[in-house]
Amino acid sequence: MAEALIRLEQVAVTLSGQSVLDNIQLSVRPGEIVTLIGPNGAGKTTLVRAVLGLLKPDSGTVWRKPKLRVGYMPQKLHVDQTLPLSVLRFLRLVPGVDRVAAQSALEEVGAEKVIDSPLQGISGGEMQRVLLARALLRKPELLVLDEPVQGVDVAGQAELYSLITRLRDRHQCGVLMVSHDLHLVMSTTDQVVCLNRHVCCSGHPEQVSHDPAFVELFGKNAQSLAIYHHHHDHAHDLHGAVVNDAPTASPPHTHVHGDSCKHG
């Protein structure tokens, strides 16, 4: 098995006296896609900051492969409407990038036609592809994608997930993908990690649903997607603490708990 690109061991973070992350164990290897899901306040943004080296944990370790090249795709980009910034000028903010390199990256994500467009004038789907192209310009060994389908319609989401899979296959980079409440998860995702300040559960996503309506909606892309049904045998209160009186209306489901879980 390939050596991990990044490995988090017993990572804990406290902000303003409140525990945000507790005993997090996580690793991403070359060619592996890890999808991180969880509700608002689960600590996903904090975890991404720790992975990127922007935040030092209060305890635990974040190990990175020496000289690891990371490409980061933010959830969204706010650009002042009065700022004269074209897609090309935006991409050239990455050191060493010229028009040829920018054009090549845009072609790789299927957005070459917008190279001279004002950044403020492109669609949500085009913006996500431009942000992905920018991440690729760093020739990353690890791609960190923060809600890459933000602001994209359902059909566009399928296309973007398919694109991310192809990029992983082509570059053999590791991918850490973050979602707020992801129902559509790629069938090629190697691991799904459910976070709510600690790792609630982790494992492989379920196989693609054969529901005719689902197949009809996604067409040829349907087979590259799966529906991940997110179930717990425990519940959290409003502060993220585990409570034992989880609803029992749904049948039990088997899943793997993280090492940090203090419940069965």
UniProtKB/Swiss-Prot annotation:
ATP binds at G38, P39, N40, G41, A42, G43, K44, T45. CDD domains: ABC_Metallic_Cations. It is an enzyme of class 7 (translocase). PROSITE patterns: ABC_TRANSPORTER_1, ABC_TRANSPORTER_2, ZNUC. SMART domains: AAA. It is found in: Cell inner membrane. Residues 6-221 form the ABC transporter domain. Keywords: ATP-binding, Cell inner membrane, Cell membrane, Ion transport, Membrane, Nucleotide-binding, Translocase, Transport, Zinc, Zinc transport. One of its GO terms (biological process) is response to zinc ion. Its EC number is 7.2.2.20. GO terms for cellular component: plasma membrane. It holds the Pfam family ABC_tran. Disulfide bonds: none annotated. Part of the ABC transporter complex ZnuABC involved in zinc import. Responsible for energy coupling to the transport system. The complex is composed of two ATP-binding proteins (ZnuC), two transmembrane proteins (ZnuB) and a solute-binding protein (ZnuA). Belongs to the ABC transporter superfamily. Zinc importer (TC 3.A.1.15.5) family. This is Zinc import ATP-binding protein ZnuC. It comes from Pseudomonas syringae pv. tomato (strain ATCC BAA-871 / DC3000). The gene is znuC.
